[in-house]
UniProtKB/Swiss-Prot annotation:
A Gene Ontology term for the protein's cellular component: mitochondrial matrix
Pathway where it operates: Carbohydrate metabolism; glyoxylate cycle; isocitrate from oxaloacetate: step 1/2
Coiled-coil spans in chain: none
Organism: Cucurbita maxima
Molecular function as annotated in GO: citrate (Si)-synthase activity
SUPFAM superfamilies according to UniProt: Citrate synthase
EC annotation from Swiss-Prot or TrEMBL: 2.3.3.16
Name the UniProt record assigns to this protein: Citrate synthase, glyoxysomal
Transit peptide: 1-43
Highest taxon in the source lineage: Eukaryota
Gene Ontology BP annotations: glyoxylate cycle; tricarboxylic acid cycle
Catalytic activity reported: oxaloacetate + acetyl-CoA + H2O = citrate + CoA + H(+)
Family: Belongs to the citrate synthase family.
Pfam families: Citrate_synt (PF00285)
Length: 516
């Protein structure tokens, strides 16, 4: 059973060989048809062979309010320092210009070398590697190493990495007890958020608030937390799934690949000799690769925001998972399934399309904040759907999805607005076909994204520009008021106030009693 305790040298060597063999076996299980289907999409990711030309210089700003001219430095990356705008003032009482950027639409708070996106060309690369190549040839654990340390591992490095993750895949019994104490119908994402936060309590050795703020300067300490979280994430997720199903948690296996082990914990029913379908495990592994990282999205930004305070990594990632729990971020594929179910049949698509154009219906799974082209992850996922259906049976909603995509991409309304399928459009169909309930979809997003969160956490610790994140605001409230006693106040009729707070019948029963 994997634990955080050391094994004997002979067992260590034996286990490394075992996990390496499992890794190589899993990598070879991808059917030729899947490899060939992905091959065509690798070309599009290579369209921009050379990096964009970098030109630095100065920007001249003329302030028409005062007639003054200002020179602002422009970096090679095409950025200016927001603090340079503070010198643009109208007088001694003016504190300078601020950038008002709701949602950070055009604000870059970090420099990062982890992932690259070109939304116009539909390109996504991890550390320079096209996502299509990694999905075709790599494994999730190998990609996690790439994201973390900047290069693909050697064979021996991969064996050490897989062993470290496996070594830390078991969770403390106290954490299992916490999960088991939650309501039987607790949402799996709520369980995951709570469990990630609770890990901080079980590992005080990893808390800078308890061990000193320089704790994470130690590479050994950092690496241990990385292995802990990547190792424990699927175990916690499996416990949440089994709690929802009314079944006891299952200990992880040390003889399976990362994705196989996850499916084993879900499906073994205590049978230690059980092995998941290798093709389904490979599909899940590819999905994990596709969801592992996506630069400064909402939840990754939350992780870096929290980490900037020096908080422990478990709390930082708990906040990130909490952000992912939001339906605008991690729950879109569930909305796609609901939409496709409501459409029902291919014959209803024209009416639905017109409803979208008339703003009477909402199309989920199309469009992206970054991509103004076909999401490269969606191309891969669409092909994976056929692989899953060949094993578990075809989902009739796939015909609706394919026809809806075709109709939208041939309609000027969507083409003009650059609305293309995103990563969520087909992923929900795959997860449903594999037997996952909709409430578990976001958990399947969170497990692999731990690698991206941790890569950004690690990068932020080494970045000399990292500061505690403290954005400015534009104040729009009352300028100055003085305190008036309650009995003398005149509250405007249209003033905001506390609304009616509902009282349960149980509370009404209690309040109707005496002695209260």
């Amino acid at each position: 059973m994997p634990t955080d305790m050391e094994l004997s040298p002979s067992n260590v060597a034996r286990h490394r060989l075992a996990v390496l063999a499992a890794h190589l076996s899993a990598a070879s299980l991808e059917p030729p048809v899947m490899a060939s289907s992905l091959e065509a999409h690798c070309v599009s990711a290579q369209t921009m062979v050379a990096p964009p030309e970098l030109v630095k210089g100065t920007l001249t700003i003329v302030d028409e309010r005062t007639g003054k001219r200002y020179q602002v430095q422009v970096s090679e990356e095409g950025t200016i320092k927001a603090t340079d705008l503070k010198k643009i003032t109208t007088g001694p009482n003016d504190k300078g210009l601020k950038l008002y950027d709701p949602g950070y639409l055009n604000t870059a708070p970090v420099r990062s070398s982890i992932s690259y996106i070109d939304g116009d060309l539909g390109i996504l690369r991890y550390r320079g590697y096209p996502i299509e190549e990694l999905a075709e040839s790599s494994t999730y654990v190998e990609v996690a190493y790439l994201l973390m340390y900047g290069n693909l591992p050697s064979q021996s490095q991969l064996a050490d990495w897989e062993f470290a993750i496996s070594q830390h895949s078991a969770v403390p019994q106290g954490l299992v007890d916490i999960i088991q104490a939650m309501p039987h119908d607790a949402h799996p994402m709520g369980v995951l958020v709570s469990a990630m936060s609770a890990l901080s309590v079980f590992h005080p050795d990893a808390n800078p608030a308890l061990r000193g703020q320089d704790l994470y300067k130690s590479k050994q300490v950092r690496d241990k937390q990385i292995a802990r979280i990547i190792g424990k994430a699927p175990t916690i997720a499996a416990a949440a799934y089994l709690r929802l199903a009314g079944r006891p948690p299952v200990l992880p296996s040390s003889n399976l690949s990362y994705s196989e082990n996850f499916l084993y914990m879900l499906d073994s029913l205590g049978n230690r000799s059980y092995k998941p379908n290798p093709r389904l495990a490979r599909v899940l592994d590819i999905l994990f690769i596709l969801h592992a990282e996506h630069e400064m999205n909402c939840s990754t930004s939350a992780a870096r925001h929290l980490a900037s305070s020096g908080v422990d990594v478990f709390t930082a990632l708990s906040g990130a998972v909490g952000a992912l729990y939001g339906p605008l971020h991690g729950g879109a594929n569930e909305a796609v399934l609901k939409m496709l179910s409501e459409i029902g049949t291919v014959n209803n698509i024209p009416e639905f399309i017109e409803g979208v154009k008339n703003r009477k219906r909402k199309m989920s799974g199309f469009g992206h904040r970054v991509y103004k082209n076909y999401d490269p992850r969606a191309k891969v996922i669409r092909k994976l759907a056929e692989e899953v259906f060949s094993i578990v049976g075809r989902d009739p909603l796939i015909e609706v999805a394919v026809a809806l995509e075709k109709a939208a991409l041939s309609d000027e309304y969507f083409v003009k607005r650059k609305l293309y399928p995103n990563v969520d459009f087909y992923s929900g169909l795959i997860y449903r076909a594999m037997g996952f309930p909709p409430e578990f979809f976001t958990v399947l997003f969170a497990i692999p994204r731990m690698a991206g969160y941790l890569a950004h956490w690690r990068e932020s610790l080494d970045d000399p520009d990292t500061k505690i994140i403290r954005p400015q605001q534009v104040y729009t409230g009352e300028w100055l008021r003085h305190y008036i006693p309650p009995n003398e106040r005149l509250v405007p009729a249209k003033a905001d106030r506390l609304g009616q707070v509902s009282v349960s019948n149980a509370s009404k029963r209690r309040l109707s009693g005496s002695g209260i």
